[in-house]
Curated annotation (Swiss-Prot):
Keywords: ATP-binding, Carbohydrate metabolism, Kinase, Metal-binding, Nucleotide-binding, Transferase, Zinc
Organism lineage string: Bacteria, Pseudomonadati, Pseudomonadota, Gammaproteobacteria, Enterobacterales
Protein's UniProt name: N-acetyl-D-glucosamine kinase
Keyword Transferase attributed: yes
Pathway: Cell wall biogenesis; peptidoglycan recycling
SUPFAM superfamilies: Actin-like ATPase domain (SSF53067)
Record has Zinc as a keyword: yes
GO molecular function: ATP binding; N-acetylglucosamine kinase activity; zinc ion binding
Family: Belongs to the ROK (NagC/XylR) family. NagK subfamily.
Amino acid sequence: MYYGFDIGGTKIALGVFDSGRQLQWEKRVPTPRDSYDAFLDAVCELVAEADRRFGCKGSVGIGIPGMPETEDGTLYAANVPAASGKPLRADLSARLDRDVRLDNDANCFALSEAWDDEFTQYPLVMGLILGTGVGGGLIFNGKPITGKSYITGEFGHMRLPVDALTMMGLDFPLRRCGCGQHGCIENYLSGRGFAWLYQHYYHQPLQAPEIIALYDQGDEQARAHVERYLDLLAVCLGNILTIVDPDLVVIGGGLSNFPAITTQLAERLPRHLLPVARVPRIERARHGDAGGMRGAAFLHLTD
């Protein structure tokens, strides 16, 4: 059996998957915020419960919003303070007496989608998350590409390309990002960025769901906003696709629930790609909230 943990700032979710990649059981508990020992106990107790329930010693994979430090194995995870700065993988492997695998949650999302029955035909899969922030992951032949510093797929921290500034205006604000840089694309393409763009142009502080509701009602202002957003997304994605050239792009995060994102994006891409480039298949994520658990469990399918 394959145990996949999706760990966030508020919850630890465990999903148990069989050899056919089907979910057999899941359970969620609150994430301890202050005590590393309590955090380890919570994970180990869930593993012990799953072992008892299924009568076996399952493989353990963990997806967490952070990056392992490749030099010493410690974890940087600002949203999970109890585990940040700790050698999480080594400690859990020792306590559970098995090989625990760990990756960031965006890579687990991408891995989950790449192992979907319909998508396994594609050698190079790119997961793109348009949610609170912008991120993603790259999967090649069923395995995550992490890079030397575990920052592969941090698409949100690419800066706006010159074509975006030409389209939006050279005086377009280069917003300061939490990473310390200015003009990172997640400040414009995330759910928060989607709302910020609307307020910037129309001086109305609406949230993304409210804007999308207006769009669905045929509101001309909301429709103009969505056109502008999709054009900006296409410009930025064009740069990424020129570097990566994936077979498939799977879009997740809150904005993926807005059908225009996946149905109207492909037609905008060719003018931002090389003439010989082919637009990849673009699909909405298939596995929703279960994607993090699935991808973490499938870290043990990558041998």
